[in-house]
Amino acid sequence: LTLLALVAGAALLGYIISLFGGIVTILITAILLAQKSLVQHVQQVADALRISLDEGRQKVAMIVGRDTGHMDQPAVARGAIESAAENLSDGVIAPAFWFLVGGLPGLMVYKIVNTADSMIGYKTEQHADFGWASARFDDLLNLIPARITAALIALPAGVHSQWRNIIADAKLHRSPNAGWPEAAMARAIDIALSGPRAYEGQMQDFPFVHPAGNQFAGPSDIDAACSMLWKAWGIALLFTTILTIL
């Protein structure tokens, strides 16, 4: 009966969405595809870690920018989970938010700025000014979505009562935005995120986010993070659909 209810609900939702034109269908489809791709890439790290540490390192190297060659298992797992939380924010929630705020123009502006920040950022001296500007604009555009993402993670996890702790944890992060979804995810599955890591051969001693959490993360914690991604996405999709129709 539950399955039938879910199928019927999905069919009804699909019918309602179809009544409101192709653009809404395209938006919902894009959100679904982005979420599915994100979960698949993160889940692949867990699956690889179950085979060997080297396999896990190779998979996590595809979704993080830090050095992965000397990572231990907890570092690999943390990297995957941090990427999951951050990309839920800037790859799924933020595009939907800016579409709701500004329609297609809002969405396009966000995607262009986010892509510019990802591709250029501070990577070359030649484009330093453009990189700085795109990074700052990207920070501005993700200010609200990052905090919404944190709430979307905290709510189904039942850790919304720890919101003050999430705020405090978010401030430990070097990014003004990435710390929010990461802090919420850390509390949701009770593990410590961030912490020391290497970039271009240089170790950087970043503080842990939710330092009281488990510091020995593994494949099962990545599984838990993927489950949280789907729960947060489900709530986001519901609100996006309702607000788009209204």
Can you say where each PLM-predicted feature lies in the sequence?
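Hydrophobic alpha-helical transmembrane segments
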Residues: L1-M108, G121-L246
